[in-house]
C-alpha cells in the first residue's frame, strides 16, 4: 500500500512539473541574449554611453521592425528603438526559422500561436495579453495553428523581451509566428486579424502606440558560404554591395509613407516566390515584414488616424559592428562574423503622419 501511495505521489509531482513547464515558455537562447536583470541594467547603461547620440521622436510611434541577432553584435541597433517603447502590451510577429521547419513542421499559410501562460523575462515572467485568446476564438481556424513546440524552438520573439521588459516591467505580449505564405494569403488573413485587433483596442479603449504596440522581428541579409548566399563574392567589395542593396530596399520601400502598393513591391524584392529579381537578399523576417505591414496598414486605415510613415533608426551588420566590448558579461555569440559569414540588421520606427 505504501509503495502505491509513493507512486501516486510521484505521479502527482511529475504531473505538476509538466503543467508548470507548459505554463511558462522556457528560454531558447541563453547565450546571445541577456536574461539577468542586473546585467541587463549594466548593458543598457553601457549602450547609453556608447551609442550614437541621435534622438528619435516617441510621439506618434506605433510600430517597428526590430533586429533579433545576438546582443553583443546588435546592441547598438536594438537600443535606440526600444528606449522609445513603453506600451502596456505588444503584439510581436516573429519568424518561422528553418530550425522550426525541420524540428517541428514545414508550416505554410498559417500564423502560429501558442498556449503558454507567460514567457520568461528578466524580472519576472512576462504575461500573455488577453488578445491572444480573442484571436483564437475569432480568427478563422484555417488561418492559424497552435503549437508550443514551434515557439519553444524559435528565438526571434524572445530576443525582444529583455529590452521590452527593461523599459516596462509589466508589459504583456501576444506572440505570433508567421509561416511562409503568398501575398494573397497574407491579405486574406490580415483582413480578419486587423479587425479583431481594432475591435479589441476599441473595446478596451487602447491607443495605438501608447497602450498597444506592434513589433516585427527580422534580421536582414544573411550573407556568405554558410547561407549559400554570396552572389557578389566574398571580399570587402562584395560586403559593400550587399549592404548597399539592403539599404536600397529599406529606403525604397520602408522609409516614407508606407502604402499597400509599396508593400507589394517590397514583396517582389524579398519573397522568393514573388520576385523576378536575379539577386534576392536573404532576410529571415521577410514573411513577418510583409504580413505585419499589410495588417498595420489596415489597422491604421480602420482607425482613420492618418498615414503610416517609416523612419530608419539604424542599419548595420555583424561584420561592421564586430563584438561590443561589454566587459564581465555572461552573454556570448551564437555565430561567427567574417566576410564569409555575416548578417545585416536594422531597426525602423513606423509613425502616424
What are the roles of these predicted feature ranges?
Residues 16-21:
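Boundary at the C-terminal end of the N-terminal hydrophobic targeting segment
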Residues 22-298, 303, 316-321:
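Active-site histidine-anchored catalytic micro-motif
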Residues 2-10:
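Sec-dependent signal peptide recognition
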Residues 296-353:
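Long, Lys/Arg- and hydrophobic-enriched amphipathic alpha-helices
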Amino acid at each position: 500500500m505504501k509503495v502505491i501511495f509513493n507512486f501516486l505521489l510521484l505521479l502527482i509531482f511529475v504531473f505538476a512539473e509538466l503543467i508548470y513547464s507548459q505554463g511558462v515558455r522556457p528560454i531558447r537562447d541563453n547565450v546571445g541574449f541577456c536574461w539577468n536583470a542586473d546585467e541587463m541594467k549594466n548593458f543598457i547603461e553601457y549602450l547609453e554611453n556608447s551609442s550614437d547620440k541621435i534622438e528619435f521622436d516617441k510621439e506618434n510611434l506605433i510600430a517597428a521592425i526590430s533586429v533579433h541577432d545576438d546582443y553583443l553584435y546588435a546592441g547598438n541597433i536594438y537600443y535606440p528603438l526600444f528606449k522609445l517603447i513603453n506600451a502596456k502590451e505588444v503584439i510581436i510577429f516573429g519568424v518561422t526559422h528553418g530550425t522550426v521547419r525541420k524540428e517541428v513542421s514545414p508550416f505554410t499559410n498559417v500564423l502560429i500561436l501558442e498556449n503558454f501562460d507567460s514567457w520568461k523575462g528578466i524580472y519576472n515572467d512576462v504575461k500573455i495579453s488577453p488578445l491572444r485568446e480573442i484571436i483564437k476564438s475569432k480568427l478563422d481556424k484555417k488561418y492559424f495553428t497552435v503549437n508550443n513546440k514551434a515557439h519553444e524552438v524559435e528565438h526571434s520573439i524572445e530576443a525582444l523581451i529583455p529590452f521590452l521588459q527593461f523599459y516596462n516591467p509589466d508589459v504583456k505580449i501576444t506572440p505570433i509566428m508567421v509561416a511562409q505564405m503568398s501575398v494573397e494569403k497574407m491579405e486574406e488573413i490580415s483582413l480578419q486579424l486587423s479587425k479583431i485587433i481594432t475591435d479589441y483596442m476599441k473595446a478596451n479603449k487602447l491607443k495605438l502606440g501608447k497602450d498597444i504596440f506592434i513589433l516585427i522581428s527580422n534580421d536582414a541579409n544573411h550573407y556568405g558560404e554558410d547561407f549559400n548566399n554570396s552572389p557578389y563574392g566574398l571580399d570587402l567589395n562584395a560586403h559593400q554591395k550587399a549592404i548597399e542593396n539592403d539599404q536600397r530596399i529599406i529606403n525604397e520601400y520602408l522609409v516614407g509613407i508606407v502604402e499597400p502598393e509599396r508593400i507589394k513591391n517590397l514583396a517582389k524584392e524579398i519573397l522568393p516566390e514573388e520576385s523576378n529579381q536575379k539577386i534576392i537578399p536573404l532576410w529571415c523576417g521577410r514573411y513577418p515584414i510583409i504580413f505585419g505591414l499589410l495588417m498595420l496598414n489596415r489597422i491604421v486605415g480602420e482607425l482613420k488616424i492618418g498615414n503610416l510613415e517609416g523612419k530608419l533608426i539604424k542599419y548595420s551588420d555583424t561584420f561592421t559592428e564586430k563584438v561590443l566590448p561589454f566587459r564581465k558579461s555572461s552573454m556570448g555569440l551564437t555565430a561567427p562574423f567574417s566576410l564569409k559569414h555575416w548578417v545585416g540588421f536594422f531597426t525602423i520606427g513606423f509613425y502616424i503622419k
